[in-house]
């Protein structure tokens, strides 16, 4: 299994246990789903206790957690402060500067860095459109939530599909470290 970690905080943000695709060589998108499960239980794609008769709510003292599977599995923390347009823009500006510095440190060429800047700017502009931005949710990893560094903010967007609204986690590829487990 591949784990995708934040290059700056070492937080686990996602894994290849979710359907995923690389968009424009820039953004990893992970397809999730809403789940109900016993607290602390980690499930890989394909198993959903809420549809398998193990609801956990009926006369049980067990704690049940509900949410998006990739958020629960990787213990991501929702950060409402990024829902403010000015705050998110400011974050993007400082974060992209850090990513460019990381790319330089990792020996990326000026052409690769220029291409990244062009693509990331277009992606951020697309997120900032009013109708889209209002629908986004923002999450961070545990270490960043504890103040142990400034890393990547995971952006979650719900998209209408045949099976209903489906959550997608979006992460900047250049700010991730892939680790085999």
Curated annotation (Swiss-Prot):
Subcellular location: Cytoplasm
Record-linked SUPFAM superfamilies: Mss4-like
Sample GO molecular function, one term: calcium ion binding
Record's keyword terms, sorted: Calcium, Cytoplasm
PROSITE patterns: TCTP_1, TCTP_2, TCTP_3
Pfam families to which the protein is assigned, alphabetical: TCTP (PF00838)
Cellular component annotations (GO), alphabetically ordered: cytoplasm
Major localization class: cytoplasm
Calcium listed as a keyword: yes
Lineage top rank: taxon: Eukaryota
Gene3D superfamilies in the record: Metal Binding Protein, Guanine Nucleotide Exchange Factor, Chain A (2.170.150.10)
Residue span, TCTP domain: 1-181
Function: Involved in calcium binding and microtubule stabilization.
UniProt family annotation: Belongs to the TCTP family.
Name of the protein in question: Translationally-controlled tumor protein homolog
Originating organism: Wuchereria bancrofti
